[in-house]
A protein has these predicted regions:
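An N-terminal assembly and electron-transfer interface module characteristic of large anaerobic redox
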Residues: 1-194
Length: 194
């Protein structure tokens, strides 16, 4: 069985996120596979706890996570530590309209993947841009993968051009520090002074 869940924050356009969620669920259901959905948008700790209990009762071999809006990585980090199963994230492409993004789901996926990679858990994501055929193809590829967890990150390394290696700003006595602790779920803000 493959578990499906959706992450969101109420500070974003929840109505728009729910519309994307319904469309994506319908595409997933058309694949005629053994899927089980946690129906509620996971928007807070209490709903997150309910999702954990739901998937404890409904054993899954893989998970599809719909990153409906931006979220921090708090829930998904604890979810992965608990279940340790392959995950495919789906983010939603949205047009820039000159202001704040309505969903900003790709940024949520980026934060989640960074947190997971720091904990040596490698995953993948796809961006759904209203092309049902491509989404179905990518979902089937994930479903049919024979191995359980990727052993490495598949992001390509890029080289820095020599033209950009010159100093842009020169500091006489540079200092870097951190005041307080990072917010929970924002592992990208970790600081190591060694």
């Amino acid at each position: 069985m493959i578990g499906c869940l959706s992450l969101a924050r109420e500070t974003f356009d929840i109505k728009f996120a729910n519309n994307k969620l319904v469309k994506t669920k319908n595409i997933i259901k058309k694949l005629n596979r053994n899927f089980i959905f946690f129906e509620d948008l996971i928007t807070n700790d209490d709903i997150g706890k309910n999702a954990l209990k739901f998937f404890e009762k409904n054993k899954c071999t893989k998970f599809i996570v719909l990153q409906s809006t931006f979220t921090d990585a708090k829930f998904i980090s604890s979810f992965v530590k608990k279940f340790k199963k392959p995950i495919l994230f789906i983010s939603f492409k949205e047009r820039r309209a000159g202001g704040r993004l309505r969903l900003n789901s790709l940024c949520g996926v980026n934060l989640a993947l960074h947190s997971l990679v720091k904990n040596k858990f490698y995953s993948n994501f796809i961006i759904y841009s209203n092309n049902e055929e491509n989404l179905s193809k990518e979902l089937l590829r994930f479903i049919n993968i024979s191995h359980t967890l990727p052993k490495k990150n598949y992001l390509k390394k890029t080289s820095i051009s020599k033209k950009t290696s010159k100093k842009i700003v020169s500091f006489k006595k540079p200092n870097l520090g951190i005041i307080g602790e990072r917010p929970e779920g924002f592992d990208t803000c970790d600081f190591n002074n060694k």
